Regions:
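General marker for long, soluble alpha-helical cores
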Residues: 1-206
Length: 206
C-alpha cells in the first residue's frame, strides 16, 4: 500500500475507529511506518493510536518503534497520553534508548509521569531517562519526582548516572527527603558526586 497512503488512511481514523480496529492492528500500522511517515502523521494522531494500545500491544512495538513514536510527541502530547502509558513506553524502550531520544523528549516523558508511574520503572530505565535529560534542566521535574527517581535507582546503578546528572538531581532534592533515603544509597551518592557539587570549583584558577 505504501507508507504515504497508510498515513493518509490513519490520519482519517478517529479514536472510535481506532478502538474498532484494535491495538494489535494499530501496532501493525505503526511498525510499517518509517520515521518520516510518523512525523507526517503528527503527535496528536500518534497519541490516539498509543492510547488505543494496551501494554501487550506497546511491548509488541519494540524499543525502536516506541522511540520513533516518542520522538514525534511534544510535552502536551505526552501529558495527553498520560503517565501510565508513558511509563509503559519507557519500559519497552529501555534505558539505552531512553538516553538517546533527546533531552526534550526524555524530559517530556518524565514530566508526564506521576511518582507512582516512575516507581513502576526499573533502575536502568530511570538511569537512562534521567541521564538523557540535560543536567541543567532536570531540576524542573521538582523535588518529589527527583527523589522518587533517586530512591528507585539501585545503589550499583548510581554511578551510571554520571556526575553531572547526579549532582543536578541531588541539588533539586530537599534535605528532609535525603534523610529518608537508605544509608547505602546516601553513601553511594556522596561517593559518586563530582567535585563541583562540593563547591570545589570555586577554588579553581578561572
Amino acid at each position: 500500500l505504501g507508507a504515504n497512503k497508510l498515513v493518509d488512511i490513519t490520519k482519517n481514523l478517529d479514536p472510535a475507529n481506532m478502538q474498532n480496529l484494535g491495538g494489535g492492528k494499530l501496532v501493525d500500522i505503526a511498525k510499517t511506518l518509517p520515521p518520516d511517515a510518523m512525523k507526517d502523521l503528527g503527535g496528536a494522531k500518534l497519541v490516539d493510536m498509543t492510547k488505543t494500545m494496551d501494554p501487550t500491544n506497546i511491548a509488541a512495538l519494540g524499543s525502536d518503534k516506541a522511540a520513533d513514536i516518542a520522538k514525534n510527541l511534544n510535552d502536551d502530547n505526552f501529558k495527553d497520553l498520560g503517565g501510565n502509558k508513558v511509563a509503559t513506553m519507557a519500559k519497552v524502550m529501555g534505558g539505552d534508548t531512553l538516553k538517546e531520544i533527546g533531552s526534550e523528549k526524555a524530559k517530556g516523558m518524565a514530566k508526564a509521569m506521576e511518582k507512582d508511574d516512575i516507581q513502576t520503572l526499573a533502575s536502568d530505565q530511570i538511569v537512562g531517562l534521567a541521564s538523557g535529560i540535560d543536567s541543567k534542566q532536570i531540576t524542573d521535574l521538582g523535588s518529589d519526582k527527583l527523589v522518587t527517581m533517586v530512591d528507585k535507582i539501585d545503589v550499583d546503578d548510581v554511578k551510571s548516572l554520571g556526575t553531572d546528572s547526579l549532582s543536578s538531581m541531588m541539588s533539586g532534592v530537599q534535605g528532609t527527603q535525603i534523610a529518608d533515603l537508605k544509608d547505602d544509597k546516601k553513601v553511594s551518592i556522596v561517593d559518586n558526586l563530582g567535585a563541583n557539587f562540593f563547591n570545589a570549583d570555586k577554588a579553581s584558577l578561572d
